[in-house]
Amino acid sequence: MEEVPHDCPGADSAQAGRGASCQGCPNQRLCASGAGAAADPAIEEIKEKMKTVKHKILVLSGKGGVGKSTFSAHLAHGLAEDENTQVALLDIDICGPSIPKIMGLEGEQVHQSGSGWSPVFLEDNLGVMSVGFLLSSPDDAVIWRGPKKNGMIKQFLRDVDWGEVDYLIVDTPPGTSDEHLSVVQYLTAAHIDGAVIITTPQEVSLQDVRKEISFCHKVKLPIIGVVENMSGFICPKCQKESQIFPPTTGGAEAMCQDLKIPLLGKVPLDPRIGKSCDKGQSFLVEAPDSPATVAYRSIIQRIQEFCSQRLPEGENLVGS
């Protein structure tokens, strides 16, 4: 599939789907039909629903297997350690929902209330929602086309009764697909704080992260920063660090310097992280002295600082 062209006339333009730059665009037929110009009424409904959510953070990755969902889960765990902070974790990886397993909530079900779907609560201040809670078995495959995935995301954002929330963390699938376009479209009016992008040190991962950064720029999604996962290996016996995935091109640090993107931190590979996820436990609690935990906590603090500097919806910087 080709990328949306840089000089796209926009769905509202008279040239939508007909201009020279529209040739080869995957959305050409949709734009030409005029359907793309009609505002989705769900956007306003979601905006109203999200008024009780202070901060909204998307967690992205260019590739699968780089630890994106693990990071999302531990970001939620870390923020929720403050009992006065209300945290919500939304899993929109529709075809690969791993959050229920990582959070120790496999087998839980979603209940309907008068005010919408009730999230599954791990703690009084940590609610979770995932398509995994809607499956009869964790082994069931979700084989859906884009429109059905988009409809599910719309329901999660509009129909879940999150209540008063300080942080909504959205765990997305890898890449830049329908799910990403949908969540950005639905949440933009509700003020997204930004995206955290997860990578590993190898160039094969960084290549896709650059595409993810390009996606963020195109849809005007602020980038909170990049996290380099699996950045060195901590031996559980001697606690010494060695390189499993050498940063052949300088890793995330060099890429961030080149693109002027904040590097939030580097999380070393600790085998206990995987064990904690398999058990559905917080690694931050199980291994508080691990260098990986220290890195996680530093990154979480930087994300909190970023969000605290974001202006409330409707306010603008002087002179902007």
From Swiss-Prot:
UniProt record, GO biological process: cell projection organization; iron-sulfur cluster assembly
Main location (coarse class): cytoplasm
Positions with a binding annotation for [4Fe-4S] cluster 1: C8, C22, C25, C31
SUPFAM superfamilies linked to this entry: P-loop containing nucleoside triphosphate hydrolases (SSF52540)
Subcellular location: Cytoplasm; Nucleus; Cell projection; Cytoplasm, Cytoskeleton, Cilium axoneme
Keywords: 4Fe-4S, Acetylation, ATP-binding, Cell projection, Cilium, Cilium biogenesis/degradation, Cytoplasm, Cytoskeleton, Iron, Iron-sulfur, Metal-binding, Nucleotide-binding, Nucleus
Cofactor: [4Fe-4S] cluster
Superkingdom classification of source: Eukaryota
Note accompanying the cofactor annotation: Binds 4 [4Fe-4S] clusters per heterotetramer. Contains two stable clusters in the N-termini of NUBP1 and two labile, bridging clusters between subunits of the NUBP1-NUBP2 heterotetramer.
Residues that hold ATP according to the record: G62, K63, G64, G65, V66, G67, K68, S69
Residue intervals passing through the bilayer: none
One cellular component term from this protein's GO annotations in UniProt: centriole
Cited Pfam families: ParA
Residues that bind [4Fe-4S] cluster 2: C235, C238
Keyword Transmembrane helix: no
One GO molecular-function entry: iron-sulfur cluster binding
Modified residues (N-acetylmethionine): M1
Quaternary structure annotation from Swiss-Prot or TrEMBL: Heterotetramer of 2 NUBP1 and 2 NUBP2 chains. Interacts with KIFC1. Interacts with the BBS/CCT complex subunit CCT1.
Functional summary from the UniProt entry: Component of the cytosolic iron-sulfur (Fe/S) protein assembly (CIA) machinery. Required for maturation of extramitochondrial Fe-S proteins. The NUBP1-NUBP2 heterotetramer forms a Fe-S scaffold complex, mediating the de novo assembly of an Fe-S cluster and its transfer to target apoproteins. Implicated in the regulation of centrosome duplication. Negatively regulates cilium formation and structure.
Classification via PANTHER family: CYTOSOLIC FE-S CLUSTER ASSEMBLY FACTOR NUBP1, NUCLEOTIDE-BINDING PROTEIN NBP35 YEAST -RELATED
Similarity comment: Belongs to the Mrp/NBP35 ATP-binding proteins family. NUBP1/NBP35 subfamily.
Name of the protein described by the UniProt record: Cytosolic Fe-S cluster assembly factor NUBP1
Organism of this sequence: Bos taurus
Taxon lineage: Eukaryota, Metazoa, Chordata, Craniata, Vertebrata
